[in-house]
Amino acid sequence: MILTLDVGNTQIFGGVYEGDNLKLTFRKTSKGTLTSDELGLFLRQVLRENGLDPKKIREVGVSSVVPDINRTIHNSCMKYLGLEPFMIGPGIKTGLNIRGRDAANLGADRVADAIAAMNIYPDRNLLIIDFGTANTYDAISKNKEYKGGAIQIGVSTSLNALIQNAALLSKVEILDPGGAASLTTEGQIQAGLYYGNLGAIKEFITRIKKECFGNEESIVIGTGGMGRLFESAKVFDVYLPDLVILGIKIALEQNRSV
C-alpha cells in the first residue's frame, strides 16, 4: 500500500492507496508544534483504527508547502513506518512543462494537482482551482504546459482576518447563506464570505480561460477541502476532492526508478 500526505499550512490531508483503490482518507491539523513522535504515532493509530496494518505500507509520498515540517515528516516516516518518504520537489519527473523564472517555487501541492488532472483528462486544457488556506488557480494546456495561475486568499483565512481586525465581529459557520442580503450580522458575514469568493472565482475563471486558452475548450476542476462549498454554484465542470493525493501517488510511481 502507498501512504500519501499533503502537508498544508492548516492541515495534513492523507490517503492510503492499494493499487488504484483509495482505501482511506484522513486529516490532521498542521498548526502549532508537531513532533515526529506525535505524527508517527498518529499515522500508526489512524491506520489501525481503519483496519489497515502499518507494516503493509510499502511507500510514502509527500507534497509539502510547509518547509518547517518536512524534517518532522521524514523522521516520523523513518521511525514509525521504516520508510523514507518521496518528496515532490524540483528535479522529479512530473510530465508537466513548467517554464518561467519562478518555476522552482510552484507549490508541491499544485504540481500534484496538475499531475493527477493530466492523468484523468489527457490532451485537454485544464483549469484547476484548489481551495484551502489560499485558493490557487492553475492553467495547464493540452500539451502539458503550465500556462500560469493565481493565488487568492482562502475563505477561512478571510474569516480569520476579519474577526481578528474587527472587535465586534465573531466567527461564523462558513456556508451558502442562500441570499446576499441578511438582517443578522452573522448572515451578513456569511454572505460576504460566500458571494465575495464566488464572484472572485467566476472572474478568475473567465479571465484565466481567455488569457491562457483563448477560444479553445477547457475543463474546470475544483478540489480542496473548501471546494465543496461552491460545488452547487456550478462553477466547476467537476469537483475532485482527492485530486492532490492521487497526484502524489502518480508522482511517486513515475519516479520509482529515479
Curated annotation (Swiss-Prot):
Q: How does it assemble?
A: Homodimer.
Give the E.C. number(s).
2.7.1.33
Q: What domain of life does the UniProt record list for this protein's source?
A: Bacteria
Catalytic activity reads:
(R)-pantothenate + ATP = (R)-4'-phosphopantothenate + ADP + H(+)
Work out whether the entry's keyword set contains Lipid metabolism.
no
Kindly list the positions annotated as binding ATP: D6, V7, G8, N9, T10, Q11, I12, F13, T133
Q: Which organism is it from?
A: Elusimicrobium minutum (strain Pei191)
Where does the protein end up? Cytoplasm
Q: Which GO terms describe its molecular function?
A: ATP binding; metal ion binding; pantothenate kinase activity
- Name the positions where substrate binds: G107, A108, D109, R110, T185
Which residues does K(+) bind?
A: D130
Q: Where is the active site?
A: D109
Instruction: State the family named in the UniProt similarity comment for this chain.
Output: Belongs to the type III pantothenate kinase family.
Report what the protein is called.
Answer: Type III pantothenate kinase
- Cofactor remark: A monovalent cation. Ammonium or potassium.
> What cofactor does this chain's UniProt record say it requires?
NH4(+); K(+)
Biochemical pathway = Cofactor biosynthesis; coenzyme A biosynthesis; CoA from (R)-pantothenate: step 1/5
Q: What does this protein do?
A: Catalyzes the phosphorylation of pantothenate (Pan), the first step in CoA biosynthesis.
